[in-house]
Regions:
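A solvent-exposed, acidic/Ser-Thr-rich amphipathic alpha-helical stretch
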Residues: 33-91
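Short, low-complexity N-terminal intrinsically disordered segments enriched in polar/charged residues
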Residues: 1-44, 144-156
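Generic anion/oxyanion-binding catalytic loop in active/binding sites
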Residues: 27, 54, 126
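Positively charged, low-complexity intrinsically disordered regions
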Residues: 15, 53, 103-104
């Protein structure tokens, strides 16, 4: 599979910007429908994890992906993501996101910038790692100073 095809695969599997991830991952029926639709795009030994706070916990399979997200979404009433940029890094695809969410105890939506690295093996998703900061993800792919069409913004 070409590197451009890797980007197309990964981006094509991301939820639309108006999809509430809190609802998607919490609803058993929606989750089962989604996994049936996308299972063939993932390696049987697919793993994922949140890379944060000097620890990494790994989850196995699509049900592990759900468990990881349910853990993350615990305090959130709503949560959605928008892709800002997808960067071709060979067998890995770096996605830069804007995340939007509303905590259960609040009426205000908050916004954050995060990143994920998706690894493709033999034309299927092999691993997904989610990072709370873009800097951490850029370092993980060896691009601390920016890459492709993305250049790290400098603090004022």
């Amino acid at each position: 599979m070409s590197e451009a095809a890797n980007v197309e695969l990964v981006v094509g599997l991301q939820p639309a910007p108006d999809v509430d991830l809190a609802q998607l991952f919490r609803d058993e029926k929606l989750w089962r429908e989604l996994t049936e639709a996308v299972a063939d795009f993932f390696q049987p030994d697919f793993e994922c994890g949140f890379c944060r706070f000097d620890t990494e916990k790994t989850y196995a399979g699509l049900d592990g992906l759900r468990a990881m997200w349910l853990e993350w979404l615990t305090p959130w009433a709503t949560y959605r993501t928008e892709i800002e940029n997808a960067i071709d890094c060979g067998d890995r695809v770096l996605l830069l996101f804007h995340d939007f969410g509303r905590r259960k105890e609040s009426t205000e939506e908050v916004r954050g910038t995060v990143a994920a690295i998706w690894t493709v093996r033999d034309g299927k998703i092999d691993r997904a790692d989610f990072y709370p900061t873009r800097d951490d993800a850029l370092k993980a792919v060896g691009l601390e100073d920016g890459c492709g069409s993305y250049v790290k913004e400098k603090e004022p």
